[in-house]
Amino acid sequence: MLFGLYVLLTFLTLVLAAAVSRSGGRQLWFSLLVLGWIVSQLNTLLEAVVFSVMPWTHAAIQLAISLVVLALLAALAVLVVGRWRRRSVEPPPLDKSLGTLGLIILAYEALYWTAGTFVWPFVADFYADRPLPPVLAVIALQVPRSLIFVAAAWPWLRTSPRFAPFVLGFAFAMIGGIAPLLPD
């Protein structure tokens, strides 16, 4: 039952992201697929594998299955908002400077540790009998994870979405944070 809620929340988030996009067709479908799959699966499972919470073989199977599911959900989201036949838009220029990437990394580190403080009471039982990784290892892993999140958002940002900061923040929180925390 809760898996169904997880899928529904993910789908509704993709519908929102599709609805505010000015693009359509395969460009929009691909951007939703990348956003949904990387945020909900790849970047989360990376941490699980690196810190030995899940073996790589299990993560690979989950990644493959979720790629198919999210491809279908992204296509359905584009269809629901009536954008499958809409032409792609010319993407706006995006700031790719090292300074911007540095600020993204710092902001992600701050958000990661802040969110972790709030989430800890809900996940502490899961980690009760597992050794926690060294803090410096966790900090170091967040650098590539922050850049992976940038890569996840990049194709969608290229669709010229309206309200991008709010929708992207909501999408990251919902499909990367809230929905995965639903109990099995």
Where are these regions (language model features)?
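Juxtamembrane/disordered regions of integral membrane proteins
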Residues: M1-D184
